[in-house]
């Protein structure tokens, strides 16, 4: 797409690490990312729901075997709008000696505070896909969590892990 412009972004974060004792660590990071001129392909549903807005993405394709021309859609990358995501990353780690080894337990994740984007083709109509299937054909999960427990000795290491993403509508 010759009209494609580069994405630009503004981002910030602030965080802290708290270690009240040698075996316990807690960290928190609040972050925000804003993207302008996001590059993505417009979904087929959006193209067909707004044919006048995306008329330049319609074309015809000749099928040689049938000799017919059919309607086709070009799924080209375009600058579609703005995106803003904000969340909190956290990590809790506990370490302890256990028998002949060391047990490390971690709980880490992201809690998404905001995930929104402008309706394609606009600069001021915001939508969200936070915990739901959005018009951008994506889901932004509010909670993404991973827990691990690792037992390590001089001879072996065993890790048990679990991952979680909350449901969506």
Residues covered by each model-derived region:
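Solvent-exposed loop/turn elements at secondary-structure boundaries
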Residues: 1-7, 12, 17, 23-34, ...
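Short glycine/serine- and small hydrophobic-enriched flexible loop segments
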Residues: 18-19, 94
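Gram-negative outer-membrane beta-barrel transporters
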Residues: 31-168
């Amino acid at each position: 797409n010759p009209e494609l412009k580069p994405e630009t972004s503004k981002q910030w974060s602030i965080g802290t690490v708290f270690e009240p004792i040698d075996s316990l660590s807690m960290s928190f990071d609040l972050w925000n990312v804003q993207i302008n001129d996001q590059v993505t392909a417009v979904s087929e549903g959006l193209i067909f729901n707004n044919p006048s807005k995306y008329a330049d993405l319609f074309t015809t394709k000749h099928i040689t075997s049938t000799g017919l021309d059919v309607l086709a859609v070009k799924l080209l990358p375009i600058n579609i709008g703005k995106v803003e995501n904000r969340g909190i990353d956290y990590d809790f780690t506990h370490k302890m000696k256990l028998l002949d080894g060391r047990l490390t337990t971690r709980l880490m994740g992201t809690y998404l505070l905001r995930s929104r984007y402008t309706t394609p083709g606009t600069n001021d109509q915001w939508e969200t896909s936070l915990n739901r299937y959005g018009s951008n054909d994506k889901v932004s999960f509010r909670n993404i969590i991973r827990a691990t427990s690792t037992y390590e000795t001089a001879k072996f290491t065993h890790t048990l892990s679990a991952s979680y993403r909350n449901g969506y509508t």
